[in-house]
A protein has these predicted regions:
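Short, basic interhelical loop/turn and adjoining N-cap
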Residues: 1-5
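Activation/maturation switch segments at domain boundaries
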Residues: 12-134
Length: 134
C-alpha cells in the first residue's frame, strides 16, 4: 500500500485536478452559450509556490488557450501534460480566475502573512517582500 503522506498528496492533487477541470468545463459551457470569457492564472503568494508557476501568475489567456511551463502544456492548474507534468501538477495550489472584463478582476487579495493587500502578481509581491526585509 501507500504511505499516509503519499496517499494524502495523491488525494489532494486529484481533488485539485477535479476542481480545476470542473471550473474549466463550466467556463466552456458559458463560452458555448455566447459568453466570451478569459482566464487568469493565480498563484499562491508564499515561498512554497514553485518557480515554474510564479512566472505564470497574472497571465491571462482565452478560455480555450493553454498555459506553458517546463515544456508542458495545459488549460489550467493541475492539468498539465508533458514529460515533466508530474512536477507541474503534484501539490499545485494555483487557481484560475475566470472573467469577462478586466474591471471584474479583484483589486485586493489575501496572503497568509500580510492579510488583505492590493492585488499584485507573484513577482511584484516577491519584490515588495524583499524590500520589506532589507
Amino acid at each position: 500500500g501507500m504511505a499516509k503522506a503519499q496517499s494524502v498528496r495523491v488525494a489532494r492533487t486529484e481533488t485539485g485536478r477535479a476542481l480545476s477541470q470542473a471550473g474549466l468545463d463550466s467556463a466552456m459551457v458559458a463560452k458555448d452559450n455566447g459568453i466570451n470569457m478569459k482566464k487568469r492564472w493565480y498563484a499562491t503568494k508564499d515561498t512554497r509556490t514553485r518557480d515554474t508557476h510564479r512566472h505564470l501568475d497574472g497571465t491571462s489567456v482565452d478560455i480555450e488557450d493553454n498555459f506553458h511551463s517546463s515544456g508542458c502544456v495545459g488549460p489550467a492548474p493541475k492539468l498539465f501534460v508533458g514529460v515533466a507534468s508530474a512536477k507541474e501538477n503534484i501539490n499545485c495550489r494555483c487557481k484560475l480566475l475566470y472573467y469577462i472584463d478586466e474591471d471584474e478582476l479583484p483589486t485586493v487579495m489575501r496572503t497568509k502573512e500580510d492579510g488583505v493587500i492590493p492585488f499584485t502578481t507573484y513577482r511584484d509581491w516577491e519584490k515588495e517582500k524583499r524590500k520589506g526585509s532589507a
